[in-house]
Amino acid sequence: MKNLFLSICAAAVLASCGSMTSASASKVGKAQPALSNTKWTLAETVKGKVPTLNIEGEKITGNAGCNNYFGTATIDPSNGGFIAGQMGSTKMMCNNISVEQNFMDMMGKANKYVITGNTLELYKDNLLLLKFTKSE
């Protein structure tokens, strides 16, 4: 029963992340504001701690829902490029590990970003993977 619940949660997260508005789609691959020194919180509702993304230069850190992660990213505002490099994380045992693994997997697949107001969207080509809201 627990595995079924986790599978349904993971499918819901993936399905909701696959949608894209035409306004966002038209901005993918175009010049974007710089991401350096920004903090973001995942906009999707997930059980447990909400994943975060902190960007300082080409270093990325945050919390994936239970474990903290860290790594590098190649970010190019001239074309909205975002490519996460190899990432590491703490290794705590977590109840929502499948959600965390999906989050980390999507971070690793992203290759573009779009900023609209206080919203950051990470894409794989034209497929929306993750949506964040700006944190203070």
Which residues are covered by each model-predicted region?
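Sec-dependent bacterial lipoprotein signal peptides
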Residues: 1-15
